[in-house]
Regions:
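Acidic, proline/glycine-enriched N-terminal capping motif
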Residues: 1-88, 93-95, 214
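Conserved, structured C-terminal
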Residues: 1-21, 25-27, 33, 103-347
Length: 347
């Protein structure tokens, strides 16, 4: 298995290590519940250095990205901002989801999921070639995510001023962006490994709780954030994955990969919904969801530490209404449908 440069640090802190897409990563450090609650109420630090970082080089980076992605990078060029977007194939299917960061000097950085890194490198390089844009995979970079309502207290000494959501601060080869995967105020730090170790040691010495993958999953589910490979893949489009808002058609003359195919699929009969239940039992991916006049399937499910009930996402027919059901261990469970962001729908 591969390991991040902080592997020994995780073990020293009591991390329970598991195989995650070929990487030895901490599932938790003793209590998933405590880690989840710490991020919701205070602050926590994640090592997400298994994710893939690609830096671009060349004069036509903007042109390349405008063709590569359905979301339009032009809206952040020159603004020290970050932008979320799916990356599509020519049929409009989702190859991955990623964040693009503007680094200054007309240069961009892409961060994508770890399980798709090799596939993404090949795809990015292929699409970039006609634009004469280089794609540099940064295999030796550190990515830390400092997340939680008190995260600013621990990052303020490293940034010149407060930065708003989806903003980027890039100085001395350290990029700090106000992005994250928890639904809380937070910052993601990308730098070389030596600096990454210094950041990690600083936060841990100041009693910031390390957070494992288990809490990361429950946090993102509560916040309504999709997990690629679980809630969406190449068989899905943004329209049936609750990210149709990323398809930017404001510039009618702009072409992008999958545009024509999406025109034919924009009236998808399926949508990604949230569900919750007061009954016991966690519905996992693959479970069938039934409602009057249709059906669907669970993509993600968990017990919510914040709301003390079982929640999840399901891909269902648009006519699903407000109530559905599922069967768990031969017992019928009543489900209530909602939007996928439970921090909004259940607050």
């Amino acid at each position: 298995m591969k390991a991040t440069y902080l592997n020994s640090k995780h073990k020293d802190l009591g991390g329970f290590m598991v195989d995650f897409s070929g990487w030895e990563m901490p599932l938790h450090y003793g209590s998933q519940l405590n880690e989840h609650t710490e991020v919701r109420t205070n602050v926590g630090i994640f090592d997400v250095s298994h994710m893939a970082v690609f830096d671009l080089d060349g004069e036509k980076q903007e042109d390349f990205l405008r063709f590569l992605l359905p979301n339009d990078i032009k809206k952040i060029n020159g603004q020290n901002k970050a932008m979320y977007s799916p990356m599509l194939n020519h049929e409009g299917g989702i190859l991955d989801d990623l964040i693009v960061y503007y680094l200054g000097n007309k240069s961009f950085r892409i961060v994508s999921n770890c399980a798709t890194r090799e596939k993404n490198l090949s795809w990015l390089s292929k699409i970039a070639e006609p634009f004469d844009v280089g794609v540099d995979f940064k295999s030796d970079y550190s990515i830390l995510a400092l997340q939680g309502p008190n995260s600013h207290k621990f990052i303020k000494s490293h940034i010149e001023k407060d930065i708003s959501k989806f903003s980027v601060h890039n100085v001395d080869d350290v990029m700090i962006a106000s992005t994250g995967y928890t639904g809380e105020l937070g910052y993601e730090i990308i730098c070389d490994q030596e600096k990454g170790i210094k950041f990690w040691n600083e936060f841990i010495s100041n009693d910031v709780q390390p957070i494992g993958l288990a809490a990361r999953d429950t946090l993102r589910l509560e916040a309504g954030l999709n997990l690629y490979g679980t809630d969406m893949d190449e068989t899905n489009t943004p329209y049936d994955s609750n990210i149709g808002w990323t398809i930017d058609l404001n510039d009618k003359d702009r072409d992008f990969i999958g545009k024509n195919a999406l025109e034919e699929k924009k009236d998808s009969k399926k949508i990604l919904k949230g569900f919750y239940t007061e009954e016991r039992g966690v519905l996992r991916g693959g479970a069938e969801v039934i409602f009057e006049g249709g059906s669907g399937v669970v993509t993600s499910g968990t017990w919510s530490p914040t709301f003390k009930k079982n929640i999840g996402f399901c891909r269902v027919d648009k006519n699903c209404g407000e109530i559905g059901s599922a069967v768990l261990r031969d017992k019928k469970i009543t489900l209530k449908f909602s939007n996928t962001n439970f921090l909004e729908s259940l607050k």
